[in-house]
């Protein structure tokens, strides 16, 4: 920490670099890497509905001074094309997820996607559920900040090294926690298709049962198929999400013989990436070791 502070003091930066963030997890990463050298305008805040959010005129005004506007990317923010057209010539839009490996939502799972823009073989936008992807994101942010603020290159590099080290430790912690679940029980059942990256990275079979809608209903055939498959597989726990219809999930759990687990944070609308991962993994382990 002393080394990082000295790097900042010696850098001679008179003003912080103005940036804006469209997603809470990106904001967290910006703080980790940018520290005192960046001034962040939080457009996407914790608790937001990332699939329904649209920037307002007041948001555009808030980010007017930002040289860099950071987005999660992978079409999580379908408004980015219009936003980029509205930016000034000195502003640059950075889609962090663009530089992270992608996974597609399969044809059989498209009905369980978060929204139409992510169905029909579209890219799954929830890339952050693989901790190694967030490590990649930190390095992307480091390089982007250093390009805009060359005097801070060493400062950003030092902070990025610290952050990526913490993420590697977090990734190992996740693997250790997952190892306590018998391999035959590593079957993650959630409402919508948001945990594909997590399941691929940490050895789970993913099943989605209703799609993302707090009000919408599930077609009878789809509901019956979900109940039958969960009952046949002996799934002990299904996991709710804040934005999904709790009534439907309760019905699926009751008729399949499963229990309702603790809710998972699917869309990253939280202030701390590490706390989100720890909470999700803790809830998954508690539910599947029953």
Positions of predicted regions on the chain:
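Short, Lys/Arg-enriched, disordered terminal segments
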Residues: 1-2, 290
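Sec-dependent N-terminal signal peptides
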Residues: 2-13
